[in-house]
Amino acid sequence: MINTILGLILAYLLGSIPTGLWIGQIFFKKNLREYGSGNTGTTNTFRILGKTAGTVTFAIDFLKGTLATLLPLFLHINGISPMIFGLIAVLGHTFPIFAEFKGGKAVATSAGVVLGFSPLFFSYLIIIFIVTLYLGSMISLASIVVAGFAIISVLIFPLLGIILPSYDLLFTLIIILLASIILIRHRDNMERIKNKSENLIPWGINITKQVPKK
């Protein structure tokens, strides 16, 4: 019981590490909340601090989710799904105690959670992400599409017997919850995509013809 409580606390604290915010403050003397979208996640870090900072931010945020799902293994915790620890880490990332409970959009950390629990399902989703990213040139659109596919797939694949061969109720519910968090956190992006003014990355074909505002 003590190990379980300790593990859940560690998962939240791990998720609460505001990677982009701290990198900006320590190495660039910039507060990401005052630049670009004001978000402290991977996309805004890339845009404001550059490729190296963005890559490091993504890697750490991603690993937060994966490591959280492995905490039961490290702490010898039985009887509780690793997905619970992953979910707690994502909640920590979204509402971090180290950053006034104002966190990122949960994409990288959620991806890390999925990898830690179901590498095959992760591989399927990452293919969708890359294809959508190339077509739209928008990380936000790719994240939104993947979240939608995750919800549909976790419900349908066990029925079809592919990738997810059987229903796992807890896994299904947590995937739906993580995807819902991502969709809710991207509401502003959805509005910009609708208005064709979303920020782009310099890769892909921008099929929706977005024109970001200067």
Swiss-Prot record:
The keyword Isomerase does not apply. It is an enzyme of class 2 (transferase). It comes from Streptococcus gordonii (strain Challis / ATCC 35105 / BCRC 15272 / CH1 / DL1 / V288). Catalyzes the transfer of an acyl group from acyl-phosphate (acyl-PO(4)) to glycerol-3-phosphate (G3P) to form lysophosphatidic acid (LPA). This enzyme utilizes acyl-phosphate as fatty acyl donor, but not acyl-CoA or acyl-ACP. This is Glycerol-3-phosphate acyltransferase. GO terms for biological process: phospholipid biosynthetic process. Its EC number is 2.3.1.275. It is a multi-pass membrane protein. It comes from the Bacteria. It catalyses: an acyl phosphate + sn-glycerol 3-phosphate = a 1-acyl-sn-glycero-3-phosphate + phosphate.
